[in-house]
Amino acid sequence: MDSAESPTKTQAGEDENYSLLCQAHEQFNNSEFDRCLELLQELETRGESSGPVLRHNRAVVSYYKTGCTQHSVLLKELEALTADADAPGDVSSGLSLKQGAAAATVARYNRAVIYYHRHMFGTALEKLAPLVARLEALEKAMAALVATLQLQLLLATNQLNRAEAFLDYLQYKLNLVATAPSSNAAEEAAVVGTAPPSAATNSSVVASPGGAAVEGAVPGLGGSLQLLQLITLVLNRKPVVIQEDGTPEYAALKAQQYYIMKDFQMAAKQLMRINNECTQAGTITPQLSTCIANNMGVIHLRVRHYAIAAKFFQNALNFDQQLARNLRQSTLQTMSSARSCEILYNLGVAMLHLRRPKEAFQCFLVPVKQFHSNPRLWLRMAEACIMEHEAKLVEEERQSQSETPSTKPYAPQSAGVPEPTLEFAVLCLRSALTLTQHYKTRFHMAAVSSEDVEAPEPKDPTQESWRHPQDNNFCNPSKPVSLESLENMMAAIYAAHSFVSLRLGDHVTALEMSEKLLACERLSDAHKLLGHMYAGEALMLMDKASEARDHLDPTFVGTLNAFDFETRDWQLKSVDAAQNVVRYNLAVAMALQNDLPQAKALLANLTHSLVANKALALRRFMDLKMGPVPGGTPS
């Protein structure tokens, strides 16, 4: 956040007022906030014409005086200040703010900073938009501040393509960041001198260490923009060499680059090195510990070490809770560092893989309040509900076999109650389906516009060009999704919706969802099998056995890919198992149509352990229904 601004003398006849403002600025830097406020009040009583400047500075000083915790009070004052201004920069003042930026401009910037630290990124982008629109007209220092915040917001909202385009705009139009070296061999050789020899042979883009990212004497901004430049390139999978400067920020970015390159072992080693070095130096903080523990959990989750990942996420949550004990009385920096929602999301996914659905559901309840537009999160909640219900069925079956009657039979629950029930799963799946259908429409619109361009156009570093790229960031806080990922998620939602509807006796919806599942593009073989099975079961339950037989034709199973069935916790581990299950269901459909001889012949070939007992029971039922064979002897 911009602090109380240092004065700039603009009129020779205001020496006394200028001296008082200099004293106020000195008192602010010395943390003498009471004395600073007195000097600002004295300036106001003198009829100083820089009313908006004094008003802004007084609000900032009062904010610092209260320990930087009264964000709402400062925000109201800043909103009132910007409301009084017709447009950014219209305020003319005798004693102007640092680098000539107007009070209303800085107030707008500070408002966006507050929203950013509160994790209200969309609102922050909206408040910052007027300043970004006139970025070229701002003073160099103010433009660098606005550009830095805008780039941070684009990255925070996973608008990676737009962030890269905005970075090009800052490089080629405003010259606020160092231009990335070209992949041209001659130009690359000129940059190699600032990088290790190995870096030149492995990368076409080299980040020169220590290069000034901002021209002019703007302390602190150069390094900040340079780091954001590297983060943008890494997240967009651009080849770039990261020169570590001993700070954990660059070291952590190096670990993230390893992770994106799927070198998970090196990513974990890099994070452990950061932890060890900072611990030995005594510079470890709860924020850094939270980041390291969460990222270690993500790495282990990626390599399917779910129990270890869950342990790291729990450690990260403990570190984060040290920061978020009382957010209402926390500073903006502490509030910005809190990551409980993201960590709980990760922990919930790990718990699902560990088949602990109740714990997973409780974890998802917190992030869904913030990321309620994420269809993948709604699907995960539905999966937790389904898994919990199936676990209860297994327990009830075990109790029935041990002759211990269940004392609490299943009863329908309210769909609006956030409990891991099938009724709430339906609500989650409806939300996921509505969001995914909406995002798929938007995705295709963006995809068509991008495919129209056959050859890459030269970069156009203008104010409007960086706004053109679109990002499919539909699943925040996760990274943008691909079209294939979106279609897979759509298929998973249809399959889960059909399954839950069958469990709840809603056969019409189950059939509708299964038919939509079979109509999906790029459908995996596993989902194709589920679609036919669910459709066949729904039709049989609707007394439409003849139509169900069309979905239970076992010939389609032979064309399925066996690798699609190698899913953890699936009972169908092979094509042979799938063939037996489909044939058994087909025999049931035949039995319902009284085609008993053909059904009995089909059952004779079912030997897989999944259906052997059920096939034997069905065969005995048909024997009883068909009666004794003429001339036969009783067995």
From Swiss-Prot:
The modification Phosphothreonine is found at residue 45. SUPFAM superfamilies: TPR-like. It is found in: Cytoplasm; Nucleus. Residues 456-470 have a biased composition (Basic and acidic residues). The keyword Cell membrane does not apply. One of its GO terms (cellular component) is cytoplasm. Residues 131-165 form a coiled coil. One of its GO terms (biological process) is mRNA catabolic process. Keywords: Coiled coil, Cytoplasm, Nucleus, Phosphoprotein, RNA-mediated gene silencing, Transcription, Transcription regulation, Translation regulation. Residues 396-416, 450-474 are annotated as: Disordered. Its main location: cytoplasm. InterPro entries: CNOT10 (IPR039740), TPR-like_helical_dom_sf (IPR011990). The keyword Phosphoprotein applies. Belongs to the CNOT10 family. Component of the CCR4-NOT complex which is one of the major cellular mRNA deadenylases and is linked to various cellular processes including bulk mRNA degradation, miRNA-mediated repression, translational repression during translational initiation and general transcription regulation. Additional complex functions may be a consequence of its influence on mRNA expression. Is not required for association of CNOT7 to the CCR4-NOT complex. Component of the CCR4-NOT complex. CNOT10 and CNOT11 form a subcomplex docked to the CNOT1 scaffold. This is CCR4-NOT transcription complex subunit 10. It comes from Drosophila melanogaster. The gene is Not10.
